[in-house]
Design a protein with these regions (language model features):
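Conserved ABC ATPase "signature" region
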Residues: 111, 118-136
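Conserved beta-strand-loop-alpha-helix hinge in the C-terminal portion
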Residues: 220-246
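H-loop/switch region of ABC-family ATPase nucleotide-binding domains
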Residues: 200-201
Length: 284
């Protein structure tokens, strides 16, 4: 589904490369978690996958980036956005304006691509229910907390059902329950065939919910593999990721053959699949 081959990028007027020689393949229906120290190049990688680089940020991009066989750099930005949804780290950057309600915000993308009103309203309500924000639908996003705004931003992308969803630190302002609900929805999206790439610093979430994880270090991909392989790598400390209580515990758990235990959630995967299993694509 996603293929990056020999990708190297530098921002306009930058002396140092933001990313160099990145090679990555992500399959359809896979959740790939990406972790890395601050400044390692994670956000740059997210922008490249979604087409915001080079279309918005400019700069010098070399190598090949394809999504579902299409060259992302060669697409119009509007076409790449139809294939790849992006949830930004700062949810305020995705809010359209003070005159809109949360319902309007979530429905905005569906309205733009001509989804019939009845279908649009149903899908908005379905996603709001899954993320626990139905009581916010008639409020202004400007009146919400940062965590609530983050859930609205996630809902506005999830509702589109793009083939690929890229999320840049989607849980940075969420409480533990909100965080786990989001990852539960991502599991349902995966089961429905969506490819998810999630950039997240909470390695315990990636270990529990992702099929594979990748480490961005020193502006390239330092490791890609199963969570049980990557998070016990002795090089984590040098990459700025290790030496946490979780990674130490993970190493011991893997050595003992233990598996993570998932907590009960108010939304089941079966319930979520009833929503996302109704069809693929923004016009389903």
């Amino acid at each position: 589904m996603i293929r990056l081959t020999g990708v190297t990028y530098s921002y306009p007027d930058a002396e140092q490369q933001a990313l160099r020689d990145v090679n990555l393949a992500v399959d359809a229906g896979e959740i790939l978690g990406i972790v890395g120290a601050s400044g390692a190049g994670k956000t740059t990688l997210a922008k490249i996958i979604t087409g915001f680089i080079p279309h918005v940020d400019g700069g010098n991009l070399a190598g090949s980036v394809t999504v579902d066989g299409s060259d992302v750099a060669g697409m119009r930005l509007a076409d790449s956005v139809a294939k790849v949804g992006l949830v930004l780290q700062n949810p305020f950057n995705q809010i359209s304006g003070a005159k809109y309600t949360v319902r309007d915000e979530i429905a905005f993308g569906l309205e733009n691509v001509g989804v019939p009103r009845e279908e649009m309203l149903r899908r908005v309500l379905d996603v709001a229910r899954l993320l626990g924000i139905t009581d916010l639908l008639d409020r202004s996003p400007y009146d919400l907390s940062g965590g609530q705004q983050q859930l609205v931003a996630i809902a506005s992308m999830v509702v589109l059902r793009t083939p690929v969803l890229v999320m840049d630190e989607p849980t940075s302002q969420l409480d533990p329950l909100g965080t786990r609900m989001v990852f539960h929805v991502l599991e349902a999206l995966r089961a429905a065939g969506t490819t998810v790439v999630v950039f997240e610093h909470k390695v315990e979430l990636l270990a529990e919910h992702c099929d594979r994880v990748a480490v961005v270090a020193e502006h390239t991909l330092a490791a890609v593999g199963l969570p049980g392989e990557v998070f016990v790598d002795d090089r984590l400390d040098g990459w700025g990721i290790g030496a946490t209580r979780f990674t130490r515990a993970a190493r011991e758990a893997v050595r003992r053959g233990l598996l993570p235990v998932r907590s009960a959630l108010p939304v089941t995967v079966e319930d979520a699949m009833a929503t996302f299993g109704r069809g693929r694509g923004v016009r389903s």
